[in-house]
Amino acid sequence: MREIFTARAERNETSARGESADESFAHLVDGFRRFRTEVYPEQQALFARLARAQQPRAMFITCADSRIVPELITQSSPGDLFVTRNVGNVVPPYGQMNGGVSSAIEYAVMALNVQHIIVCGHSDCGAMKAVLDPAGLQQMPTVKAWLRHCEVARSLVEQNCSCAAGEALGVLTEENVVAQLDHLRTHPSVAARLAGGQLSIHGWVYCIETSEILAYDATSGRFAPLDGDGPLPVATPAPRYLQA
């Protein structure tokens, strides 16, 4: 969401690229035409299979920021990811707001039987900037209310982290992912599958500039490179009721 959270942007006829509104939309239509004529014919068998059913490998909960493309980051094909996006990659605790995110989680777990749920934050997150400095949200009451689900992360950083100048945003971004993982575990469908060893959860932070992903490891309480040496960082709690 970039600077929209720190300064009220005045919309005009041109976009950040210097295009008019008509030119911006024409770019999207041209892209669709290329998809129809160049991409779809080569993937027609895949789309024919997907037209009948979906069986995604994972659920991917991430920010609405236009710079984050889950399928690109993970090199996934259509049908591989069940993606849910919102401002700040928020997962409301169960019962507080049983809306789009909560229903998507329940459907992914109970109907699609996903075996992995990834909560992915990212660098330069406008939502996290707004959590640190909410003054720019006065004209966006809905966003302000939504970001209250990030308050636990802000409070944790404020009371426990002696961050140097410029470090608070990165630390908050990581702590927000951990907080949303905690919220995720309050959902009955998730809690039951975790306890039975049928579901794994993952917390990632993606760096837009470098393409690096840091993953949360619950045992150490730290984030480590996803493609680093050694075992993969694991955010999943130990199962208590392993299926026979």
Indicate where each model-derived feature is located.
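Short beta-strand segments
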Residues: 61-63, 85, 118-122, 202-207
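Catalytic core of membrane glycerolipid acyltransferases/transacylases, capturing the structured
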Residues: 67-87
